[in-house]
Amino acid sequence: MRTTLLLLIIAITVMVFVSEAYAAPAPEPILKQGTIESLTR
């Protein structure tokens, strides 16, 4: 029960961060692209 609640909290937090990232216009698209490239590399 406790682990399920923890996972739910994590999922909500991640969704909030993702929605904020998509809602806010990227001030530095080049920096964002570089971050994605470094993550996928």
Swiss-Prot record:
<protein>
    <recommendedName>
        <fullName>U-megalopygitoxin(11)-Mo28</fullName>
    </recommendedName>
</protein>
<comment type="similarity">
    <text>Belongs to the caterpillar 11 family.</text>
</comment>
<keyword id="KW-0800">Toxin</keyword>
<keyword id="KW-0732">Signal</keyword>
<comment type="function">
    <text>Probable toxin.</text>
</comment>
<feature type="signal peptide">
    <location>
        <begin position="1"/>
        <end position="29"/>
    </location>
</feature>
<dbReference type="GO" id="GO:0090729">
    <property type="term" value="F:toxin activity"/>
</dbReference>
<keyword id="KW-0964">Secreted</keyword>
<dbReference type="GO" id="GO:0005576">
    <property type="term" value="C:extracellular region"/>
</dbReference>
